[in-house]
């Protein structure tokens, strides 16, 4: 019975539910899009290219593993944890003998993969270029289509796609920047793969040259294993697993027959789809990044959606106050009213959820493509679209709508029928403002109390608002103590949402306080100003529903746009203050080769090579840099606060104050870490420095880091010299792509890289902001559309169309001022706490012009969303509206 009535009610009130439908549909689309990113991170396929012809691949373990054992209440709990390392781990070449003796093995092919960037104007078409030995071409396989195989150290075979793009053929010369100095090679042949290779460019060298460039003597990247005739891939995998498994395997390593089985100390055996992550390490790491991005976006979207949709349903229930009061008067129980509104919301939420989920699927694909274009996600991780994200969005939308309706219906379903009718009468006619105020003053004491309660705050709402406000303050306080970006970023946006939610609950009180402040200036604008003031004061609940999404929009936008500059400016300032060098040598390619630094030193320049990596201390990740110790204090000043950099060697390290605090280190202490390629190292701390934000948490010796990274080329070279820029350029002229920059120009280059990283965050939160902007327009339009009868009575009382529209503009601008103050205040508090935690100073980077633009956009949205429905409402004759039945 109640469901049938709810269906008829929705059918009869299609226009009234339009606002809620749009909000819910946008929320479902956003949740679905975020869900597809999360699904891709969890289940996305990484298709192998290089190892397509090798059904089984043996490679090194790409994880740092830790096992913890806890004894509690007579029980022993063992936990196994693993975190990925930043660089490629290598296997001993001697393992080939063991593999070759394994039953069912026809051939074992050692693989070497290393940096090999061809220096041509045509480039590689956005593909990453790798070097290999021609002996491993059978892994794909590649076959010669013209020319001959490489035999001499100067010979080179290139793939056909690159040859066509660069217009190269056998006999041509090609300069390649690999891990050593750039070298000119003679192209002896062109090869083509027999399977699709879409995400990389391959260059094949002679066996000896490949070993030299790989720079890991006695080690290989992986082994491709080809089965003997009649041996299946599964049987081959099982045989190799059995052959390689050692009794001394670490606790927690997998020995079951799974597609990926870590064995012994380093080796792992992979087959099927598990070969892809072995080949594309960045794609495997991107899984974690996508799960993080999708989860953060989805969680924020859900919180914002609930906040916005509750406001939408509050307005919807207010518009139906007279109808619901009448139902209460004719014996409808509180439970029946709640069930009616809840089922209406479920109907609207389900329909909107289906439509939004269908829209969210292409939106998720667009988001994935944008992340790929920005470099945040490699194209090798294939986008996955399953049934779970749209289904989850549908359920979340329907439940969100039902919850919002229950929250919005709490008061109307609880008050007595006579009181409901009295309030509905008080809110009728011009009772949007002055009328309601007059009726309140004229009523009895009990009536005045009830009407004031309706226009203001209930005790429960006030208490909930204060609790959330306190929660927001706690989050801000916690944020000021967080000193790592991964920890502080989610808390930053959560604090904005929680504080905005407290604004939603305390909104009526805030609106009334704002009216007291603005009453004087607004009243000076004439009768329309006085009427606008009365409307704002008399309809604080309705105006609060409008203020909430606008506050969230301004607060969230300011936070998103100013978080990265706050961090980037502080890091840039530390970098500028810490670079003592006269010049900085950088490269447009993969890096500055060591030979360039040697040539500068040969001319008596003071040179510091800088190579960057990421290491693990335990399972925690730290940014590290390797620097050449000789003459270091002439080119670099990290503001040492304890110890000295004079003792920096391959057996020692310097740490930032943050790392020293987290790891409880001081000069003379021992630092145990895992280098980028998984190699453990034990170092002695010789110095602690303050400028960790600009230079990383750990500083090691250059040679130590360079031996354990995929790209040993220097990211920059600091040069202290009396020579001019022109003289340095002349010295380095034989190194293509190398540039000599002033320290300020190098800082600008670093700023551009940070901007590229910031664009990922802008995109991640941009859709949430777009949804919030839609909610602002939707809520304002609903608020104005509700007041058709009020506008008609004002016109019958003598007001002109222009005066009514001016009143609406004054109301909208008043709401914008309040929302701008609240949103900006929330953003300032959150950004200040973020700045204190991350930089140690309460100095958020806020660009005044950008802030003014944000407020101006919010004002424009408010004015347009008010003017359009207002003009539409005023087109109908006032007498017709005033005499029509509600």
Model-derived features: positions:
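Membrane transport/envelope proteins' first extracytoplasmic loop
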Residues: 3-306, 315, 689-767
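Alpha-helical transmembrane segments, especially those used as permease/efflux helices
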Residues: 15-18, 289-292, 392-405, 428-563, ...
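Membrane interfacial helix motifs at helix-loop boundaries and amphipathic/re-entrant anchors
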Residues: 37-53, 253, 260-261, 273-303, ...
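Short cytosolic juxtamembrane segments of multi-pass membrane proteins
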Residues: 413-440, 446-452, 874-886
């Amino acid at each position: 019975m109640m469901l049938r009535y709810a269906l008829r009610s929705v059918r009869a009130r299609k226009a009234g539910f339009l606002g809620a439908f749009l909000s819910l549909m946008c929320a479902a689309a956003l949740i679905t899009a975020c869900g597809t990113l999360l699904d891709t991170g969890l289940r996305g396929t990484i298709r192998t290219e290089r190892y397509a012809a090798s059904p089984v691949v043996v490679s090194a373990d790409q994880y740092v593993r830790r096992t913890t054992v806890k004894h509690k209440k007579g029980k022993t709990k063992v936990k196994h944890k693993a975190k990925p390392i930043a660089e490629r781990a290598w296997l001993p070449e001697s393992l080939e003998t063991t593999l070759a003796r394994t039953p069912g093995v026809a051939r074992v092919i050692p693989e070497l993969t290393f940096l090999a960037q061809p220096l041509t104007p045509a480039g590689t078409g956005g593909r990453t270029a790798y070097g290999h030995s021609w002996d491993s071409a059978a892994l794909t396989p590649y076959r010669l289509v013209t020319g001959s195989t490489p035999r001499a150290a100067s010979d080179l075979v290139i793939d056909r796609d690159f040859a066509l793009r660069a217009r190269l053929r056998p006999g041509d010369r090609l300069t390649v920047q690999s891990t050593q100095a750039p070298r000119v090679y003679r192209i002896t042949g062109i090869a083509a793969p027999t399977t699709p290779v879409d995400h990389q460019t391959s260059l094949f060298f002679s066996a000896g040259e490949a070993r030299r460039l790989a720079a890991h003597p006695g080690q290989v990247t992986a082994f491709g294993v080809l089965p003997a005739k009649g041996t299946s891939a599964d049987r081959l995998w099982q045989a190799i697993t059995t052959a390689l498994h050692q009794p001394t395997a670490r606790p927690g390593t997998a020995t079951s027959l799974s597609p990926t089985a870590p064995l012994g100390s380093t080796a792992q055996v992979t087959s099927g789809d598990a070969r892809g992550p072995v080949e594309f390490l960045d794609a495997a790491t991107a899984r974690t990044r996508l799960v993080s991005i999708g989860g953060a976006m989805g969680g924020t979207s859900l919180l914002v959606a609930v906040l916005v949709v509750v406001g939408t349903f509050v307005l919807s229930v207010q518009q139906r106050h007279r109808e619901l009061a009448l139902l209460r008067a004719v014996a409808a129980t509180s439970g029946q009213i709640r069930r009616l509104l809840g089922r209406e919301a479920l109907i609207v939420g389900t329909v909107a959820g289906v439509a939004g989920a269908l829209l969210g699927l292409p939106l998720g694909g667009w988001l994935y493509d944008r992340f790929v274009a920005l470099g945040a996600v490699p194209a090798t991780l294939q986008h996955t679209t399953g049934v779970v994200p749209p289904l989850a969005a549908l359920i979340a939308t329907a439940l969100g709508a039902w919850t919002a309706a229950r929250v919005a219906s709490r008061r109307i379903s609880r008050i007595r029928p006579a009181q409901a009718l009295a309030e509905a009468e008080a809110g009728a006619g011009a009772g949007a403002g002055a009328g309601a105020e007059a009726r309140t003053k004229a009523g009895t004491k009990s009536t005045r109390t009830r009407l004031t309660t309706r226009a203001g705050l209930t005790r429960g709402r006030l208490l909930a608002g204060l609790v959330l406000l306190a929660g927001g303050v706690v989050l801000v306080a916690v944020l000021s103590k967080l000193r790592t970006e991964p920890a502080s970023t989610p808390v930053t946006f959560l604090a904005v949402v929680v504080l905005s939610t407290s604004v939603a609950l305390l909104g009526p009180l805030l609106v009334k306080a704002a009216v007291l402040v603005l009453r004087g200036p607004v009243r000076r604008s004439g009768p329309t100003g006085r009427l606008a003031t009365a409307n704002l004061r008399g309809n604080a609940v309705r105006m609060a529903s409008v203020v909430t999404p606008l506050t969230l929009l301004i607060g969230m936008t300011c936070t998103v746009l100013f978080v990265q500059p706050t961090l980037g400016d502080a890091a840039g300032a530390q970098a500028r203050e810490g670079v003592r060098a006269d010049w900085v040598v950088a490269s447009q390619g993969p890096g500055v080769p060591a030979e360039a630094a040697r040539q500068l030193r040969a001319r008596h320049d003071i040179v510091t090579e800088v190579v960057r990596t990421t290491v693990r201390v335990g399972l925690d990740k730290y940014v590290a840099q390797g620097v050449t110790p000789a003459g270091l204090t002439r080119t670099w000043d990290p503001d040492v606060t304890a110890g000295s950099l004079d003792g920096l060697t391959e057996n020692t390290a310097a740490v930032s104050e943050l790392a020293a605090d987290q790891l409880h280190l001081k000069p003379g202490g021992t630092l145990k870490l895992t280098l980028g390629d998984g190699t453990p190292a034990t170092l002695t701390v010789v110095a602690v420095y303050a400028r960790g934000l600009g230079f990383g948490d750990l500083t090691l010796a250059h040679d130590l880091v360079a031996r354990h990274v995929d790209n040993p080329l220097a990211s920059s070279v600091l040069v202290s010299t009396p020579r001019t820029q022109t003289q340095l350029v002349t010295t380095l002229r034989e190194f293509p792509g190398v540039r000599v920059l002033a320290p300020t120009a190098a800082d600008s280059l670093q700023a551009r890289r940070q901007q590229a990283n910031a664009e990922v965050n802008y995109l991640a939160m941009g859709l949430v902001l777009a949804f919030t902007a839609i909610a602002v327009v939707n809520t304002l339009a609903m608020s104005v559309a509700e007041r058709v009868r009020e506008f008609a009575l004002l016109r019958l009382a003598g007001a002109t169309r222009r005066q009514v529209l001016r009143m609406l503009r004054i109301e909208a601008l008043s709401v914008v001022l309040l929302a701008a103050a609240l949103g900006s205040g929330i953003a300032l508090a959150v950004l200040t706490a973020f700045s204190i935690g991350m930089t140690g100073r309460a100095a958020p980077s806020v660009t005044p012009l950008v802030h003014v633009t944000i407020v101006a956009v919010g004002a424009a949205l408010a004015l347009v969303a008010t003017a359009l429905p207002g003009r539409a409402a005023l087109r109908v004759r006032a007498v017709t509206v005033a005499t029509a039945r509600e």
